[in-house]
Swiss-Prot record:
SMART domains: RHOD (SM00450). GO terms for biological process: tRNA wobble uridine modification. It catalyses: 5-methylaminomethyl-2-thiouridine(34) in tRNA + selenophosphate + (2E)-geranyl diphosphate + H2O + H(+) = 5-methylaminomethyl-2-selenouridine(34) in tRNA + (2E)-thiogeraniol + phosphate + diphosphate; 5-methylaminomethyl-2-thiouridine(34) in tRNA + (2E)-geranyl diphosphate = 5-methylaminomethyl-S-(2E)-geranyl-thiouridine(34) in tRNA + diphosphate; 5-methylaminomethyl-S-(2E)-geranyl-thiouridine(34) in tRNA + selenophosphate + H(+) = 5-methylaminomethyl-2-(Se-phospho)selenouridine(34) in tRNA + (2E)-thiogeraniol; 5-methylaminomethyl-2-(Se-phospho)selenouridine(34) in tRNA + H2O = 5-methylaminomethyl-2-selenouridine(34) in tRNA + phosphate. This is tRNA 2-selenouridine synthase. Monomer. It comes from the Bacteria. The active site is at residue 95. Keywords: Selenium, Transferase. It comes from Pseudomonas aeruginosa (strain LESB58). The gene is selU. PANTHER family: TRNA 2-SELENOURIDINE SYNTHASE. The keyword rRNA processing does not apply. Residues 12-136 form the Rhodanese domain.
């Protein structure tokens, strides 16, 4: 039998499969990549056992748990655990603290299925704390540089081109602006933090000591950046990405109109997808009505409605450029210009996409190992 493990680092570096035996309500609040939920108890059973524990103590709670999970129900759950163990012979199981629930699953697997399957000592809480410390240590020990620039200048493309970048928007599944929602949901806050920490862990394991981030606010959609990282971002050096206005319009048209329509249609089907995509754009514009002002909003909203009608009718996207240009000139560019004033003393390089990528690669190469 393989031993129970406290080698949290190796679990994440090697993408070891994990079986989470917590209740679904716990799992959906936050888990880890390469994890599946095969609960010992469902949400209602867990609630009953928890109440029993508070009122009558541990032994009564354990007895109730065995009473609730027995017979055909126990056999069904045991079959799910057995299937996971056989499909993932290098995996581990865990509960919240690595205590009774994971030990009971281990015992039942051994007694009823003849399978010795190891658990993660300390469970979910220990794994979570390890990842929290991974992010904190990186902020303390590594160098960071931010990529800034006007809306649509291609910051995401720079992040994708570098092997020492951390894609905050990718981990959050959100583009970070009022129009940043994707066709699929954002992860839970804890899942976002865990994904980011594992990315940091793997890159540091490869020898990365200098990370490139996009200059973001504290909130990316519904996901909040780790506080210590966000605080550091208020003083990190900044590289400013520049691009022509026309190119920025075309990039936004591609990302937020052409590609995003396709994304919605892949997820929910062609007809419903276009309707959802149209509603998303109009809702996003309405979300900044107070900042735009009533007259400006009405004008841009009318252009957007016309653009969507034309796109739905014959696929034309030309009219979309009208509201995109208006938003850039009248809203986003002035806002970014104002924000940039407070960051000007941190800008160490300016250039187009190729120049910025080249500079950041050279910056990484020159960093002492």
């Amino acid at each position: 039998m393989r031993d129970n493990t406290q080698h949290y680092r190796e679990l994440f570096l090697d993408d070891i499969p994990l079986m989470d035996v917590r209740a679904p309500v716990e799992y959906h609040k936050g888990a880890f990549p390469n994890t599946v939920n095969r609960p010992l108890m469902n949400d209602i059973e867990r609630q009953k056992v928890g109440t029993s524990y508070k009122q009558h103590g541990q032994q009564a709670a354990i007895a109730l748990g065995h009473e609730l999970v027995c017979g055909a129900l126990k056999a069904e759950r045991l079959a799910a655990w057995k299937a996971f163990a056989e499909a993932n012979p290098n995996g581990y199981l865990y509960c919240f603290r690595g205590g009774l629930r994971s030990q009971i699953v281990q015992q039942w697997l051994k007694q009823d299925a003849g399978i010795d399957y190891p658990r993660v000592i300390g469970g979910y809480k220990a794994l979570r704390n390890f990842l929290f410390e991974t992010t904190r240590a990186a902020v303390d020990e590594c160098d960071f540089v931010l990529v800034g620039g006007l809306t649509g200048c291609g910051k995401t493309e720079v992040i994708a081109a570098l092997d020492n970048s951390l894609d905050l928007e990718g981990h959050a599944n959100h583009r970070g602006s009022s129009f940043g929602r994707r066709a699929t949901p954002q992860p839970a806050q804890i899942d976002f933090e865990n994904r980011l920490a594992i990315d940091i862990l793997k890159k540091r394991h490869r020898g990365v000591g200098q990370f490139v981030l996009e200059d973001e606010g504290r909130i990316v959609g519904s996901c909040s950046l780790p506080l210590e990282l966000y605080q550091g971002m208020q003083s990190y050096p900044l590289v400013w990405l520049e691009d022509a206005f026309e190119q920025r319009v075309e990039r936004i048209l591609r990302d937020y109109v052409i590609d995003l329509r396709s994304e919605f249609e892949r997820v929910v089907g062609v007809e419903e997808g276009f309707a959802a995509f149209s509603a998303y754009l109009q809702k996003s514009l309405a979300g900044i009505v107070k900042r735009l002002g009533g007259e400006r909003y009405q004008r841009l909203a009318a252009i957007l409605v016309q653009a969507l009608e034309e796109q739905g009718r014959d696929g034309s996207v030309d009219t979309h450029r009208g509201w995109i240009e208006g938003l850039l000139k009248e809203y986003y560019d002035p806002m970014y210009a104002f924000q940039r004033q407070s960051k000007e003393d941190r800008v160490e390089f300016r250039g187009n996409q190729a120049e910025v990528i080249g500079y950041l690669r050279q910056r990484q190469a020159l960093r002492p190992s």
